[in-house]
UniProtKB/Swiss-Prot annotation:
GO CC field: cytoplasm; ribosome
UniProt domain comment: The PRC barrel domain binds ribosomal protein uS19.
The family this protein is said to belong to: Belongs to the RimM family.
A Pfam family recorded for this sequence: PRC_RimM
Residues in PRC barrel domain copies: 97-169
Name the record gives this protein: Ribosome maturation factor RimM
Described function: An accessory protein needed during the final step in the assembly of 30S ribosomal subunit, possibly for assembly of the head region. Essential for efficient processing of 16S rRNA. May be needed both before and after RbfA during the maturation of 16S rRNA. It has affinity for free ribosomal 30S subunits but not for 70S ribosomes.
Keywords: Chaperone, Cytoplasm, Ribosome biogenesis, rRNA processing
Cellular localization per UniProt: Cytoplasm
Organism name: Bacteroides fragilis (strain ATCC 25285 / DSM 2151 / CCUG 4856 / JCM 11019 / LMG 10263 / NCTC 9343 / Onslow / VPI 2553 / EN-2)
Keyword Chaperone: yes
Any GO BP: rRNA processing
InterPro entries xrefs: PRC_barrel-like_sf (IPR011033), PRC_RimM (IPR056792), RimM (IPR011961), RimM_N (IPR002676), RimM_N_sf (IPR036976), Transl_B-barrel_sf (IPR009000)
Length: 180
């Protein structure tokens, strides 16, 4: 059985394309094209199910048409409408740290070299120029800049990001809490 911690979300199947079972796929990470893995994982009724890729072709930087094995009709393809698509972490790790998308780091623990454990990454905010790790710290949301110069190390095996935050950055969050 595939567990949630063994995969990470890379996109969504939108709707069937044509009559031969192709699916329109919107993705946030093209790891399926860069890593040596011939299947995608779909979340169906809260169960992670692998499907082998028969073929795919890109339509843009964030969309592709995907043909899955055994999905040969538009009717069968409709069953995948709005289905979340995941990729196995073990195959993504083979791609190397420089080739990973930000979504890969959701679920990683964050530790600071001086302050110790900070929490777990629940999301990555890429809506601005400065990408931020959204970290759950005992129920509070902590925003940590995802900048290379602040990251002291990444342990993919144990899912830990070690950061070296500047003095005062963590206390800024505490000041915001006091003003509220």
């Amino acid at each position: 059985m595939i567990k949630r911690e063994d995969v990470y979300k890379i996109g969504l199947f939108n709707k069937p394309h044509g009559i031969h079972g192709e699916l329109s796929f919107t993705f946030t990470d093209d790891i399926f094209d860069r890593a040596d893995c011939d299947y995608l994982i779909c979340r169906l009724d809260d169960i992670f199910v692998p499907f082998f890729i028969e073929e795919y072709r890109f339509r843009s930087d964030s969309t592709a048409l995907v043909k899955l094995e055994g999905v040969d009709t538009a009717e069968r393809a409709r069953m995948f409408t709005n289905v979340e698509v995941y990729f196995p972490v073990k195959h993504a790790e083979e791609a190397g740290p420089g080739e990973l998308s930000w979504d890969f780091f959701v679920g990683f623990r964050v530790e600071d070299v001086r302050h110790g454990a900070l929490g777990k990454v629940t999301d990555v905010d890429t809506s601005t120029v400065n990408t931020l790790f959204v970290v759950d710290r005992d129920g509070d949301e902590l925003l940590i800049p995802a900048q290379e110069e602040l990251i002291a190390g990444i342990d993919q095996k144990h899912k830990i990001i070690t950061v070296d935050l500047p003095e005062g950055l963590l206390s800024l969050d505490e000041c915001d809490d006091e003003e509220s």
